[in-house]
């Protein structure tokens, strides 16, 4: 192990590697902050460039895009209530309320530190414990994936802002959106309403832009210039910096969320969005300030960002040890490895251990450099909130439409985003929350596909979910999650009643 580390460090420590990391991070952060563009797109665009590069700088360029894109999604989630990437969807829950309170710098700084913490944690786990974790995740099949998704859906209870019925209905709407298009098992079309272009379904990024950005612009149609002037006067950035006491308070949350993110990321087919929601729910249930969650609680930002960035390292675990990509980005990285003459899988640690350890050490460096770059640019991001509302609205519209169009070069996708935005605006007026819908969209396909595959495995017997230890564990966690929600709700009502008496 020590020899591999020293050899990998020597191979990685070159000017070409550091330049590749720096360029990858900067480009990734910018692309991740544009709603509609994701790290997947950035990696695909840069893949041909890496063909003529040495293996380590080539892979570090792509990993810089991956990590930078994951972190960059939090910037727009916090500033304009629109997650730049699907994994940052949960960050809007507390990030944007902090901006509304005149504390964008505090939220952005916490997102940066949490992203660094989670990313570094998972990079170190990848470096020192990849084979052990890979052996553990090999025991997961369709029943386990289904139960993980059910556990994720149980979170709807705690993010429904006191109205669990509307939260559940929102979750069902999200699942319906996820099921539009081609059946992933049989291949038949469903819920397309005669529109052939819906056969491919609605891309997640289109749904995100519609539900958040377009709906937010519509909800501000009663814009008042005086209100905007007052808002700008209250944004005193010099007096809202993140304190050491607040960072210290979030350390426990970041640690637990990083563990959750690392485990979830190591399970193929899950990803940062699921990890972020699970971590947010866990943080809310265990925090002393759980009543502040959803209203601008810094712990909420630390939970979601440390979790989704913790998946960046752990998604590489099944890729490097078994040749199985953990998410969309690592599926592209699989092709990048093969372009460099390396085939990910069990033999990779034997045949290319020096290069592999160089890449893993480089991932640690990527997260450290991301912290440095973020510290330089975060104050500049925060000043975006000072832009006049009329100009900001125009920028957001152009930003989002360009991002959605660029993702698939389709005006139909732009039209879908506008329709979803109008629908989301109507739901907001009726008192529905957006986040339960997003959770349903993220988990809908995972629930359906793995449930049906589990039924095939068991001969249509539901007993498969309670006879396998890990599936039973996640089902128990789902029941416990719902039970804790109702218990704490009853406890809070009793406390309020006592105070009134």
Question: Which positions does each model-derived feature cover?
Answer:
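Transmembrane alpha-helix interface/packing and boundary motifs in multi-pass membrane proteins
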Residues: 25-39, 68-81, 156-161, 258-270, ...
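Re-entrant/interfacial helical elements at transmembrane boundaries that shape
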Residues: 39-48, 62, 77-97, 128, ...
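Helix-loop-helix hairpins and the membrane-proximal interhelical loops
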Residues: 1-58, 131, 137-138, 189-297, ...
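Short helix-coil transition sites and intra-membrane helix breaks within transmembrane domains
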Residues: 31-41, 78-89, 121-125, 264-274, ...
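Membrane-embedded alpha-helical segments of transport systems
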Residues: 67-72, 113-125, 133, 177, ...
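Membrane-interface alpha-helices at helix entry/exit sites of multi-pass transporters
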Residues: 56-60, 97-114, 288-300, 324, ...
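Membrane-embedded alpha-helical modules
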Residues: 109-222, 339-493
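A structural-propensity feature for long, helix-poor, extended segments
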Residues: 66-77, 84, 297-322, 326, ...
């Amino acid at each position: 192990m020590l020899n591999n580390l020293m050899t990998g460090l020597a191979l990685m420590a070159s000017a070409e590697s550091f330049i590749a990391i720096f360029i990858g991070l900067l480009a990734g952060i910018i692309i991740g902050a544009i709603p509609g563009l994701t790290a997947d797109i950035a990696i695909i665009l840069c893949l041909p460039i890496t063909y003529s590069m040495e293996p380590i700088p080539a892979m570090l360029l792509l990993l810089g895009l991956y990590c930078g894109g994951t972190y960059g999604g939090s910037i727009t989630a916090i500033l304009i209530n629109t997650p730049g990437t699907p994994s940052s969807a949960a960050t809007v829950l507390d990030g944007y309320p902090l901006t509304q309170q005149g504390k964008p710098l505090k939220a952005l700084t916490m997102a940066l530190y949490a992203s660094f913490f989670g990313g570094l944690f998972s990079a170190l786990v990848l470096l020192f414990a990849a084979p052990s974790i890979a052996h553990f995740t090999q025991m997961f099949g369709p029943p386990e994936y289904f139960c993980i998704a059910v556990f994720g859906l149980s979170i709807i209870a705690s993010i429904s802002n006191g109205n669990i019925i509307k939260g559940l209905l929102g979750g069902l709407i999200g699942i319906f959106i996820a099921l539009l298009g081609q059946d992933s098992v049989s291949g038949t079309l469903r819920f397309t309403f005669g529109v052939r272009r819906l056969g491919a379904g609605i891309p997640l990024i289109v749904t995100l832009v519609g539900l958040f950005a377009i709906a937010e612009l519509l909800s501000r149609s009663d814009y008042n210039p005086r209100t905007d002037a007052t808002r700008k006067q209250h944004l005193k950035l010099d007096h809202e910096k993140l304190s050491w006491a607040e960072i210290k308070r979030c350390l426990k949350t970041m640690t637990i969320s990083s563990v959750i993110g690392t485990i979830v990321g190591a399970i193929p087919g899950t990803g940062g969005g699921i990890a972020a929601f699970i971590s947010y729910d866990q943080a809310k249930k265990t925090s002393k300030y759980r009543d502040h969650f959803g209203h601008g609680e810094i712990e909420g930002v630390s939970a979601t960002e440390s979790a989704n960035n913790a998946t960046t390292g752990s998604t590489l675990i099944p890729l490097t040890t078994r040749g199985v990509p953990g998410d969309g980005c690592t599926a592209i990285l699989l092709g990048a490895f093969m372009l460099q003459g390396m085939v990910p899988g069990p033999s990779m640690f034997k045949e290319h251990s020096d290069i592999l350890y160089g890449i893993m050490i480089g991932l640690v460096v990527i997260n450290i450099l991301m912290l440095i770059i973020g510290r330089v640019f975060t104050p500049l991001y925060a000043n975006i909130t000072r832009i006049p509302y009329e100009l900001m609205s125009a920028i957001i519209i152009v930003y989002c439409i360009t991002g959605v169009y660029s993702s698939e070069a389709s005006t139909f996708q732009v039209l879908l985003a506008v329709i979803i935005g109008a629908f989301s605006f109507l739901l907001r007026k009726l008192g529905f929350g957006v986040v339960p819908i997003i959770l349903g969209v993220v988990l809908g396909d995972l629930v359906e596909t793995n449930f049906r595959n589990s039924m095939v495995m068991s001969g249509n017997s539901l007993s498969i979910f309670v006879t396998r230890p890990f599936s039973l564990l996640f089902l128990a966690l789902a029941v416990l999650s719902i039970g804790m929600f109702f218990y704490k709700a009853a406890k809070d009502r009793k406390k309020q009643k006592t105070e009134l008496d």
